[in-house]
C-alpha cells in the first residue's frame, strides 16, 4: 500500500504552483532559524496555530522539501474530503472530543504512519494547540505530538535521534490578505536524549516534561502574551503603540521589538499593579473608540501624520485611474472573495479564502486576458497587457490597503480628542 509520503506526479506538478501563489499572498515572507533544524535526524515540527489553513501553507512553501502535516480528525469525516486531504499529504489525528471510539480505532495506526514518515526523512508538521485561535499566545499543547515522538523513538531511536523542532509563525495581521509572514525555528529538543536521561520516569511524566520544554521554546518564537493574561487586549494595543511600525525593517527585528515591549509591560504590571490596571482600562476605552472611528494603529503610531497625509493624498490622486482599472479588471476575484468571506462566521478563515480564490480565479482570468489580448492587439501591446494583468490583483489589494490607511490617517489627523487620549497613555 502506498505511503502518504510517497511520490505523486500530480502533487509534484501542482506543488510549485501552490507555493508560488502562497508567496504572492504576502507582501513579505521571511524564514529564520533554519540552522536549528538537525540533519540526518527524524524531525517533528510543533507549530503555533492562529490562521487556519495558512498555518500549513506557510511552512510548506518555504522550500521544495517533502512535508507531511497532521490535522484534527473531525474534518476527515466525509470520504471525498478525506481523499483530498490524503492527496495534500495531511494525516488525521483524533481527540477525545471526537469520541473515544474514534481515538481508539484510529490513532494507533495514525501514530505508526506518522513515525514512518519521519523515519523516511520526511519533515512532519503538527499544530499541538489542536485548534486555531487569532491570539498572540499559546493554548495548552495536546499530547499527540509527544506520543508520535515517543513512538518514533521507541521504533528507531537507536538508529537516528528523534527531534521536536519548536516553530513559530508570526503574521503581520491575522485578517488582512497580503500582510507579512515570519517563520522561526527554535532550539530543537532531542527526544532520544531526553528519554535516555529519564529512563526511571513513566511516559506521562516524560510527556509533561517535553510539553513544558516545547511550550517554552515555542513562546520565544512569537509575540507571546501569556494565555491567562486577563489584560491581553490592552497589552497588545500598548505593544503596537510602543513598538511602532517600521516599514522596511526585517520581520525578525520587528518580532524582537514586540517581545521586548511585552516583557517590559508585564514587568511594569507586576511592579505597579494598580497603576497598570488603571492604564489598561484607559487603553481599552481608547481602542474601542479608535476602532469605532475606523482608525488604524499605524496612524496612531505615525509621528509625522500631517506630512504622511500630504504625500499619501498626492499618491492617491495620481494612482486613482490605475486603481479604478484594477477594481474593474479583477472584479470576479474580489467579489467572489467577499461573498465567500461573509459565509464564514470565523473571520480567521479570511486569508485562506483570499488565497484560494486568487489561486483558482487569477490563472483562469490570466488565460482569458492572454487570449483576448493576442487576438486583438499587436504582440508588443498584448505582451505588455498580459504582464500588467498578471500583477493587477496584487496591485489592487495593496492599493486598497493603502487607501484604507490613507483614510485612517486623515481621520486621525483631524481627531484631536483621540490624539489627546493617546498622549495620556
Q: Where are the predicted features?
A:
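Soluble catalytic domains of membrane acyltransferases
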Residues: 4-205, 322-425
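Short hydrophobic alpha-helical module
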Residues: 221, 286-289, 293, 320, ...
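Long, charge-rich alpha-helical interaction segments
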Residues: 212-299
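Transmembrane alpha-helical segments and their cytosolic interface motifs
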Residues: 298-330
Amino acid at each position: 500500500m502506498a505511503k502518504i509520503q510517497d511520490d505523486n506526479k500530480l502533487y509534484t506538478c501542482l506543488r510549485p504552483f501552490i507555493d508560488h501563489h502562497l508567496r504572492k499572498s504576502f507582501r513579505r515572507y521571511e524564514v529564520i532559524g533554519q540552522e536549528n533544524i538537525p540533519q540526518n535526524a527524524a524531525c517533528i515540527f510543533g507549530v503555533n496555530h492562529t490562521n487556519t489553513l495558512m498555518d500549513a501553507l506557510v511552512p510548506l512553501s518555504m522550500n521544495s522539501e517533502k512535508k507531511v502535516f497532521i490535522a484534527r480528525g473531525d474534518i476527515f469525516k466525509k470520504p471525498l474530503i478525506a481523499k483530498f486531504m490524503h492527496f495534500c499529504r495531511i494525516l488525521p489525528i483524533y481527540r477525545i472530543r471526537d469520541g473515544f471510539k474514534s481515538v481508539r480505532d484510529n490513532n494507533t495506526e495514525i501514530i505508526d504512519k506518522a513515525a514512518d514518515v519521519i523515519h523516511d526523512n520526511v519533515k512532519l508538521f503538527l499544530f499541538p494547540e489542536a485548534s486555531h485561535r487569532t491570539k498572540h499566545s499559546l493554548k495548552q499543547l495536546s499530547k499527540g505530538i509527544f506520543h508520535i515522538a515517543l513512538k518514533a523513538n521507541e521504533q528507531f531511536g537507536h538508529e537516528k535521534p528523534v527531534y521536536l523542532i519548536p516553530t513559530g509563525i508570526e503574521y503581520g495581521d491575522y485578517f488582512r490578505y497580503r500582510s507579512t509572514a515570519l517563520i522561526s525555528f527554535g532550539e530543537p529538543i532531542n527526544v532520544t536524549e531526553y528519554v535516555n536521561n529519564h529512563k526511571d520516569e513513566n511516559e506521562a511524566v516524560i510527556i509533561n516534561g517535553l510539553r513544558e520544554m516545547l511550550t517554552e521554546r515555542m513562546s520565544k518564537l512569537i509575540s507571546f502574551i501569556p494565555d491567562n493574561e486577563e489584560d491581553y487586549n490592552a497589552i497588545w494595543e500598548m505593544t503596537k503603540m510602543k513598538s511602532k511600525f517600521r516599514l522596511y525593517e526585517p520581520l525578525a527585528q520587528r518580532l524582537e521589538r514586540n517581545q521586548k515591549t511585552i516583557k517590559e509591560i508585564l514587568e511594569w504590571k507586576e511592579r505597579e499593579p494598580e497603576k497598570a490596571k488603571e492604564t489598561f482600562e484607559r487603553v481599552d476605552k481608547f481602542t474601542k473608540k479608535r476602532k469605532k472611528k475606523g482608525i488604524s494603529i499605524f496612524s496612531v503610531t505615525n509621528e509625522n501624520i500631517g506630512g504622511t497625509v500630504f504625500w499619501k493624498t498626492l499618491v492617491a490622486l495620481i494612482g486613482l485611474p490605475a486603481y479604478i482599472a484594477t477594481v474593474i479588471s479583477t472584479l470576479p476575484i474580489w467579489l467572489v472573495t467577499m461573498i465567500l468571506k461573509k459565509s464564514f462566521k470565523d473571520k480567521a478563515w479570511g486569508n485562506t479564502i483570499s488565497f484560494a480564490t486568487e489561486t483558482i480565479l487569477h490563472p483562469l482570468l490570466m488565460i482569458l486576458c492572454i487570449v483576448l489580448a493576442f487576438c486583438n492587439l499587436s504582440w508588443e501591446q498584448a505582451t505588455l497587457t498580459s504582464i500588467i494583468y498578471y500583477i493587477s490583483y496584487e496591485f489592487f489589494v495593496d492599493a486598497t490597503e493603502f487607501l484604507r490607511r490613507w483614510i485612517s490617517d486623515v481621520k486621525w489627523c483631524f481627531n484631536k480628542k483621540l490624539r489627546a487620549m493617546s498622549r495620556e497613555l
